Amino acid sequence: MHTFSTLPAAEGFRMPAEYEPHRGCVMIWPVRPGSWLYGGRDAQPAFAQAARAIAESETVWMLAGPADAGAVQAEFAGDENIHVLTIETDDAWARDVGPTCVVDEHGTVR
């Protein structure tokens, strides 16, 4: 793993706006009881539908905790552009709790 010794802004990196072109979308499978009734059961079909719609034009990385990863992998087994990653999560709002990238004026991603 590479560790950077400076802050991204010091090297000309910035957080891109949501509407800017990007490589793909990170989603998190909804299961958290504090956010979703019945372990997300009623929200999961909508998340699957949204992921498939997004995957028509870009890569989707769907994060799922170890307890749910098998079922989520089965859900998207036939979807070539959706990649399920087994990662412990705390919520389904990837924008709030997921990974993020910064870019510079040359399009370099960090």
Protein language model features and the residues they cover:
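Histidine/cysteine-enriched polar flanking segments
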Residues: 1-110
